[in-house]
Amino acid sequence: MTFSFEYRKFGDFTYNVLSDPTEIKSYLMKWIMREWELDHDEAPHEHWTVAWMEILPGMEFSLQVIQLDDIHPNADLMSVEDFQHSLEERADEREEAMLRGVSIEPLLVNGDGFELMDGYTRYTVLKRYTQKEVYAYVGTPGHV
């Protein structure tokens, strides 16, 4: 399956975005769910990953421009010292790539409370560069 990404400059960085809600959902189910499954295999005690895996399939998504300051990282995840250390290292590497013009995906945000579900490294770099608004795939409860 291929996806029809568009490349858009926004703020100081270039994003590779999907606009079609069905395509966004397919992309997230294929790639983000796989990433979370691997995370869960490595750290089954991390309850936030389980919660995200449970709600993702039932959500509908849209590409939105939102205020970066409105996004809330998961407090439990951010309290893990090893995660904080690795996040800073990954953010340093990602920052260099972004400054060299490498595009980034929109952040993945739960529209109910604006919890950051995916994109902690990108979020960290975007905060460093005081981006006011960012692209995000915002998820809301789907139709059951």
Where are these regions (language model features)?
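A structural signal for short coil/turn segments at secondary-structure junctions
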Residues: V102, Y129-T130
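Surface-exposed, charge/polar-rich loops and edge strands
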Residues: T2-S62, L68-H85, K132-V144
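Glycine-centered loop/turn positions within well-structured domains
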Residues: E105, Y123, K132
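A sequence-level detector for short glycine-anchored, His/Arg-bearing signature motifs
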Residues: G113-Y129
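Short alpha-helix boundary/capping and kink motifs at helix termini
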Residues: P57-M117
